[in-house]
Swiss-Prot record:
An example Gene Ontology biological process: response to oxidative stress
GO MF annotation list: 4 iron, 4 sulfur cluster binding; iron ion binding; pyruvate-flavodoxin oxidoreductase activity
Name the record gives this protein: Probable pyruvate-flavodoxin oxidoreductase
Enzyme class: oxidoreductase
Physiological role: Oxidoreductase required for the transfer of electrons from pyruvate to flavodoxin.
Swiss-Prot/TrEMBL keywords: 4Fe-4S, Electron transport, Iron, Iron-sulfur, Metal-binding, Oxidoreductase, Repeat, Transport
Residues the record lists as binding [4Fe-4S] cluster 1: C689, C692, C695, C755
Annotated binding of [4Fe-4S] cluster 2, by residue: C699, C745, C748, C751
EC number: 1.2.7.-
Signal peptide: none
Length: 1174
């Protein structure tokens, strides 16, 4: 047996039964594609002895089209997708079904974006394609996901009907469980060679040509559609036979419809997907209580066989609940319910049933909403009611339409040998550690191990909760652990926020990672936690994992330490056995990164065993603090009730009435979150400061702020809040203040690294230095609160805007959930400092939409006048077109308001009317609009003009997204929008990979970089988006890098915004996926520009009107070879260690390519210069 997750299990079968695989990343299906690509890169073979060809496409539409072409020419082909990706495939799925083309698409089912995007699991995507004509087979767990991947492949070849094999996103795709793997011989024996040969014989071939894809007319189209009926009528039998053949080969028997429960059941639940295992557990328990209940598992959903459904349903049943994991607003009911109801009604009408059971329908589990035993008990209880609800929801509290069922207490006995919860911080290694623990237990013991991981959409820095179960029996529990034998808190700050000890079983183990020793930690715990630990009679332990990790050179990665502590305390494996297994796992995971890293992790294991301390339980200390409120009392009511509950992990309990129905949320809620995740924060040493504001500009989270204020504003300042006389001539007589937001800083250290001011006696000391947050937080909180209330600078009064002055303007993008050290967010922050009070932002899906609009807290905020960026996200693929709609509307509204001005011209002073129709700065225009409103306030007929007069204030339209959007999936729209003459500004945050989905290659990925979907190094040069858009001639194009030239960045943004047409800014954005310490990113950015890797330029068509060449090249010719600089990044180093000979050639190719690109730019700029690297 093997321990594996659902995606891995499916990918293994799909890879071995395919010849061509077209891929594109989308959560939660991406890892299937990643593994297929990696296996192909390593030369692994399919069951026929060939290595499948794996190709990444620009979108899911491209992937399915490639599959279509491969199938039409005789290949066995597949792809993997989810959610919006599946929807992009719909037109081609219709074609595949209409052409009776055998093929399997593997889908990790996920929520489709509606009022909000959600990466989590339900059936809304697969239900949106049920009309395409594809057969649909649903797996309920990891074992089924693997097995059905093969059964669907057999059935599609037998039936010629394309199959969608789906399973629940995250709950199955990412659940780790112990399964029986399929051997190559078994797969090969089961694959129907006769049908494979027939598929190949139908291939398009000029040796025996045919025509497909014709355009039909009314005389024959209808008949042709009906001609496929026999093939669909035969699908059920093909699937059943494939399942029987599979059983004969493996011993695992499945049926398209399968009943589980009492043979004379009176109450039955019908559903499909991962919730089946939970229902089976409840059925088992209720059977022991003498109740006649059961569950009917739907596996083959399309074609839907009413005959076989009714054969599987006990004739004794008197009430049925059909559960759908989707919502179809406006429909009579959800899809599975309607199918079941139709089957029963037709059977009754045809005389095949004498009576009809009562059938009720419910929705559950949307967006991975928890569906546990209590939900199943509630449904069975409703089936017993005299008048059950015909339509209901379960798992939420609906106080608006009152559809929800009350949830009883979960009374199921627990048979697990061990249940454990691990609370970690995204990027601290907790999830990876738990995955290793599960695999160690599963692979080295006869026990079954299950792992599931709960996290939000933050890339890093968010809460992660890992669930681990160990049992002597196969684990069916597809729900979260509510009471655990072991709870590990990997971050001290969580003690104040989350109810963790409350989830401990009586006598359970509570392990806390803390800098405080066993002697001092008790008084540091909130009184509530002390009381719970006493109540549970917990065994309480502490370890200073962060200290051990630092001592072993592992930075913030505490996973190795916490893994060893878990095994040491639970003794689920004997101590020496656990140590040996962990050492082996470390060697396997890190050997490619060098033996030194392996040995440092081994050292951490040894120290961890020695460092765990037990803390005796003590009475509640009356001098200890209470758990602080989740948000400040000063927060708005909505934040205190709704946002606070979500921040505390209690959002599941919020009623329907508490939430906005249309997805509209308040701004600026990150200011109330106060994550406190930094171990160290920057402290200002003012006597060394040059007031350059580089630290403020570099800060990814707007957690360092600078202000220039009148001296009197500092008269009542806290003693620890320092200020300096302003050095700049244009601000003489004022005070300069620099201050950190101590609870919002992520501790990335970037500010310290970019600070140019050093102590002459000790260059290690700078004008800002990292110091312990715990030692400084209380004092700095007081300072920051005072700082925020200091007067703001008036942007319009600044003599010039450069990097120094721009950073005195309060940002309207703050404390986002981006990764620590993120290279994207400083650009967005700068935009809001320059134009935030009049910005409209269309944001493509990706990292920037997640840290920009991920609940429960959002970073875009408003100024003192209530103005700020108005932000919206549509989709990944359509952002350019979406933003164009903003521009067209703004222009149209302005035209209408100007028309209304003319209509009331006789009531407006001539001077004001002329001014309103002339150019003006936004500040002046707002004064004019205020004057207009005052002038027409008593004119009742002018209400429309007064209401909409703000349209006269010019809006700054920005279309923001990453390189995956701009270079790949959204390129067609971006290209079209730029081909127009509309005044839109496009900012591409170029990380050179799909950062949000885990670092897959895009067309922006450079030569030689190793990424997911490019495990053996990019073999071709990156697409030059900037140069290609220059070819239009009328587009402003700039390539910038904040770390390379701060002021060039500011200048390019200002020019782009002022340009009266389309503009494109491509901003180099360091990312964690690049594989180096992002604290050093600005230095790396400078070096990359020096090598020619990222030249800086501004292409301004207006320069041609002045008799100049449009292109201004702002960086010098390459002055050094790129190899040394690129090898600072793991994405380039990996190729050196994997394939040194290939890497050596690619470095030469890269140097030549960079030089050629620079020479082309220099020629365009009239600066034909020779490289300094020759």
């Amino acid at each position: 047996m093997i321990t594996i997750d659902g995606n891995g299990a499916v990918a293994s079968v799909a890879f071995r039964t395919s010849e061509v695989i077209a891929i594109y990343p989308i959560t939660p299906s991406s890892t299937m594609a990643e593994q297929a690509d990696a296996w192909a890169g390593n030369g692994l073979k399919n069951v026929w002895g060939d290595t499948p060809r794996v190709v990444e496409m620009q979108s899911e539409a491209g992937a399915i089209a490639t599959v279509h072409g491969a199938l039409q020419t005789g290949a066995l082909s597949t792809s993997f997708t989810s959610s919006q990706g599946l929807l992009l495939m719909i037109p081609t799925l219709y074609k595949l079904a209409g052409e009776l083309t055998p093929f399997v698409l593997h889908v990790a089912a996920r929520t489709v974006a509606t009022h909000a995007l959600s990466i989590f699991g339900d059936h809304s995507d697969v239900m949106a394609v049920r009309q395409t004509g594809c057969a649909m087979l649903c797996a309920a767990n990891v074992q089924e996901a693997q097995d059905f991947a093969l059964i669907s492949q057999i059935a599609t070849l037998k039936s010629r009907v394309p199959f969608i094999h789906f399973f629940d996103g995250f709950r199955t795709s990412h659940e780790i469980n112990k399964i029986v793997p399929l051997a190559d011989d078994t797969i090969l024996d089961l694959m129907p060679q006769v049908e494979i040969d027939a598929h190949r014989a139908r291939a398009l071939n000029p040796e025996h040509p045919v025509i497909r894809g014709t355009s039909a007319n009314p005389d024959t189209y209808f008949q042709s559609r009906e001609a496929t009926n026999p093939w669909y009528n035969a699908v059920y039998d093909h699937v059943e036979q494939a399942m029987n053949d599979f059983s004969a080969a493996t011993g695992r028997q499945y049926q398209p419809f399968e009943y589980y429960g009492h043979p004379q059941a009176e109450r039955v639940i019908i559903l499909m997907g991962s919730a089946i295992g939970t229902c089976e557990e409840v059925v088992d328990e209720l059977l022991t209580r003498g109740e006649k209940v059961g569950v009917l598992k739907v596996r083959l959903y399309r074609p839907f066989s009413a005959k076989h459904l009714l054969q599987a349903l006990p004739g004794s049943v008197r009430s049925v609940a059909v559960l759908d994991r989707t919502k179809e607003p406006g429909a009579q009911a959800e899809p599975l319910y309607l199918d079941v109801m139709t089957a029963l009604a037709e059977a009754f009408n045809n005389g095949e049933r004498e009576t009809l059971p009562r059938v009720i329908g419910g929705r559950y589990g949307l967006s991975s909403k928890e569906f546990g035993p209590d939900c199943v008990l509630a449904v069975f209880a409703e089936l017993n009611a005299a008048k059950p609800k015909a339509r209901f929801t379960v798992g939420i509290y609906d106080d608006v339409t009152n559809l929800s069922l009350p949830l009883p207490e979960n009374t199921l006995p627990n048979s697990a040998k061990l249940e454990a919860l691990f609370y970690g911080l995204g990027s601290d290694g907790s999830v990876s550690a738990t995955k290793n623990n599960i695999k160690i237990i599963g692979n080295s013991t006869p026990w079954y191990a299950q792992g599931y991981f709960v996290y939000d959409s933050k890339k890093a820095g968010g809460l992660t909760v890992s669930h681990l179960r160990v049992s002597e029996q196969p684990i069916r529990s597809a729900y979260l652990i509510s009471q655990a034998d072991f709870v590990g808190c990997h971050q001290l700050q969580f003690i104040d926020k989350y109810q963790m000890a409350e989830r401990l079983k009586p006598g359970g183990i509570f392990l806390l990672n803390t800098p405080y020793s066993a002697d001092e930690v008790w008084s540091r715990l909130p009184q509530e936690v002390q009381a719970v630990l006493n109540q549970k009679k917990a065994r309480f332990y502490v370890i200073n994992a962060a200290k051990i990790a630092r001592e072993c050179g592992l930075a913030a990665r505490i996973n190795t330490v916490m893994q060893m502590a878990f095994f040491h305390l639970t003794q689920i494996l004997p101590g020496d056995s656990a140590l040996a297994e962990l050492q082996g796992a470390i060697a396997k995971s890190y050997s490619s990164k060098g033996q030194d890293l392996v040995e440092r992790n081994w050292q951490a294991l040894a120290l961890a065993r020695e460092s765990v301390e037990e803390v005796p339980l003590q009475p509640v200390n009356p001098h200890s603090a209470n758990r602080p409120p989740v948000v400040s009392d000063a927060a708005p009511d909505f934040v205190k009730t709704v946002t606070a509950a979500m921040l505390a992990g209690l959002g599941d309990a919020l009623p329907v009435s508490a939430l906005p129905p249309d997805g509209t949320w308040p701004m600026g809620t990150t200011r109330w979150e106060k994550r406190n995740i930094a171990e160290e924060i920057p402290i200002w040493k003012e006597e060394l400061c040059t007031q350059c504001n580089h630290c403020v500009a570099a800060c990814p989270h707007s957690a360092i702020r600078a202000k220039v204020v009148p001296p009197e504003a500092m008269e009542n300042a806290p003693a620890s809040l320092h200020s300096l006389d302003v050095k700049s001539r244009d601000m003489r007589g004022q005070k300069y203040v620099l201050q950190v937001a101590p609870e919002d800083c992520t501790g990335c250290n970037l500010c310290v690294e970019v600070c140019p001011a050093k102590d002459r006696q000790n260059p290690e000391i700078k004008a800002i230095n990292m110091m312990s947050r715990l030692e400084h937080v209380e004092e700095e909180k007081i300072n920051y609160d005072f700082f925020l209330n200091l007067p703001e600078i008036d942007r319009s009064k600044l003599e010039r805007i450069d990097i120094r002055t721009s950073q005195l303007i309060t940002p309207l993008f703050e404390y986002s959930g981006a990764c620590s050290g993120c290279g994207e967010t400083p650009y967005i922050k700068l935009l809001t400092q320059l134009y935030g009070d009049r910005m409209l932002i269309a944001n493509a899906t990706g990292c920037s939409s997640i840290y920009g609009g991920n609940l429960p807290s959002t970073p875009y905020t408003t100024d003192a006048n209530g103005r700020g960026p108005a932000w919206a996200n549509s989709l990944f693929e359509d952002n350019a077109e979406f933003g164009l709609g903003f521009r067209l509307t703004v222009d149209q509204h302005r035209v209408r308001v100007l028309r209304l001005l003319d209509q009331f011209a006789d009531k407006i002073p001539a001077e004001l009317l002329t001014a309103l129709k002339s150019d003006a700065t936004p500040e002046v225009r707002r004064e004019q609009v205020a004057a207009l409103r005052q002038q027409l306030n008593d004119v009742a007929e002018a209400h429309e003009l007064l209401r909409d007069a703000d349209a006269l204030v010019e809006k700054s339209i920005w279309l923001i997204g990453g390189d995956g959007w701009a270079y790949d999936i959204g390129f067609g729209g971006l290209d079209h929008v730029l081909s127009l003459t509309e005044n839109v500004n496009i900012l591409v945050l170029d990380t050179q990979c799909y950062s949000n989905t885990g670092g897959q290659a895009s067309k922006a990925t450079p030569l030689g970089a190793v990424t997911k979907f490019g495990e053996h190094g990019k073999r071709k040069a990156r697409k030059d988006l900037g140069v290609s858009m220059m070819m239009y001639g009328h587009v402003y194009v700039a390539q910038i890098s904040l770390g390379a030239q701060l002021n060039q960045t500011v200048k390019a943004i200002q020019e782009a915004e002022a340009y009266p047409g389309p503009s494109l800014i491509i901003a180099y954005s360091p990312c964690e996926e690049h594989g180096y310490d992002l604290a050093l990113s600005h230095d790396q950015m400078r070096q990359l520009t020096a090598t020619g890797f990222w030249p800086l330029y501004r292409f301004d068509p207006r320069r041609a009107d002045e008799g100049k060449l449009p292109l201004a090249l702002d960086s010098r010719p390459p002055s050094e070879a790129p190899e040394e600089t690129l090898l600072h990044e793991q994405r380039f180093r990996r190729l050196n260690s994997q394939q040194p000979e290939v890497a050596e050639q690619l470095w030469k190719d890269a140097a030549a390519d960079l030089q050629k690109r620079y020479d082309f730019l220099a020629q365009m700029a009239g600066k034909a210069e020779k490289s300094n690297t020759d």
